Amino acid sequence: MIFNRYLPRMTCMMTLATLLAGCKLPGIHLLGDDEPAMTLAGDESQNVFFFTSDSSFETDIGLVGGSEYRLSITIFSNWADSYIAENENQEALNEREFSNKLMPVALLGATRSSRSHQWFELMIRQSRCPRESLLGVSDLSYDEDSRSYRFTVNCSGELTLYVNDTFGFYGNNMGAANIALTRLN
């Protein structure tokens, strides 16, 4: 009896919560525009300011499938995941990650956004094909001379950035960086 009386209310509340959450959940665009603000032309660059506390930073930069890009990272403030500010080699955290060994409980490794990438690794993806386009900086080729990463995208869509962490725990992340993206061809 009680179940029948509250079922319509619960259904309405669940639907409303899903719609409202869809505005902010990574990769879900129920009420928003999925078109990026700009697409880079050949040899054109764009800079964005990235905070590690953002679980899904939509850059408004459109990537074109089959095109090659260069990604340069300049860290402005020290990166930290809660109390972890150094990797296993006692070096300051950067876009490259830290090992699961530094987590207080090893099982937490199963909760990070991408289990095939390390903690706090800078991740990139495109909005229209989030699974196929998901890459960590460890997947990209690194050019020591220019201190930048190169990659080719396999689909078109808006560039989204985040560090590999547990969803819901981005608020304890600290740090910022300038991300420069250049389309090479």
PLM features: what roles do these ranges have?
Residues I2-T11:
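Bacterial N-terminal signal peptides that target proteins for export
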Residues L20-G22:
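C-terminal motif of bacterial Sec signal peptides marking the signal peptidase cleavage site
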Residues G27-N185:
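Gly-Asp-aromatic-enriched flexible segments
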